[in-house]
Swiss-Prot record:
The gene is rplF. One of its GO terms (biological process) is cytoplasmic translation. This protein binds to the 23S rRNA, and is important in its secondary structure. It is located near the subunit interface in the base of the L7/L12 stalk, and near the tRNA binding site of the peptidyltransferase center. It comes from Histophilus somni (strain 2336) (Haemophilus somnus). The keyword Ribonucleoprotein applies. This is Large ribosomal subunit protein uL6.
Amino acid sequence: MSRVAKAPVSIPAGVEVKLDGQLLTVKGKNGELSHTIHNSVEVKQDNNQLTFSPRVGIANADAQSGTARALVNAMVIGVNEGFTKKLQLVGVGYRAQMKGNVLVLSLGFSHPIDHVLPAGVTAECPSQTEIVLKSADKQLIGQVAADIRAYRRPEPYKGKGVRYADEVVRMKEAKKK
């Protein structure tokens, strides 16, 4: 059995978990998330805990049980506390602002970039060079942050671009004559 799957997922107060066959739905103060669990994983709900165990005789059941446990744990944390991702814009003239559900980015191109945020993700700009994303869905917020970063990844000579707040950009030296 997977080391990750051995630990049960505890369900905090205010979070409701509904198991319908292989479809698991988690509802909390930040919204509702659902996930279809792989057929090789058996899920049991006891009081305020979910346990995951691999079905016998299926090749990758151990790995799938660990994956299912990690995904469900992220769902429980997301609907209870939520996730945040912070992005920084480094560079002369690089700016971000919110217009309704659209994030408008000025990243040194000849035109501004309009990035429409998907449902379930909210953004705010505390300053012109900072973006704070919030969501209950860990996978979705990570994908949105990666999409925004992909418009202008940090370059290794001056460090200009869009970076995660905790990202360390490895700098290169300029070519010497």
